[in-house]
Amino acid sequence: MTRHEPPGLPVRPAYPAGRPPGPGGRSLRLFVACELPGEATEALAAVQRLLQERDAEGARWVRPEGIHLTLKFLGEVPARRLEAIERALARAVREPFRLSVRLGRLGSFGGSTGLRVVWVGLEGEVEALAHLAARVERALEPMGFPRERRPFAAHLTLARVKEGASPQDRRRLFDLVRSLELPPLPGATLEAVSLMQSTLEAGGARYQCLARFPKSSPAGA
């Protein structure tokens, strides 16, 4: 879960006991994202409940507080590289910004028999979001993080399909996603880029914000 930090960013995490930052063999699972305001998170949780109530078998649900807009996935990174990554992001996202988006349609990746992900799309200033993602890509590419081959798609992941899900479960969930009519969903204002850490646990991944950019970003943006 993202912590709410006072101004004066980038923020530093409270690392789990026995896992302090520093050089050595320890690695962090990192990604770059835009976090969502509370109203959007609550609306997405309601969409998850609508799907769950309709017998969406085979899905592994993202914790509502962990739903975010991914700009760049970095993977397992040595902890000693953390400060260099923060400096690169600080250069890429220097100026304050405000992007207005709306929660849009329900969709999926993978087709009816290979369904992998269920998501809600974003509408509004998505072209500006794509430019923001491209700035992040350019900043991190010289550090050995290759650019994404696929074009940027502004979406918020609600669920991932379990590896052992049957073709029937995938088809049922695919049909549900196609047929479900969503109620009107709220908009959101995005004002910060966050460097996030993902920790895999038995109940699913937990996310923690390590730093936000630009440095003047409000906490929890």
Regions found by a protein language model. Give the residues of each.
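Histidine-dependent nucleotide/RNA phosphoesterase domain, centered on the 2H-phosphoesterase fold
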Residues: 2-221
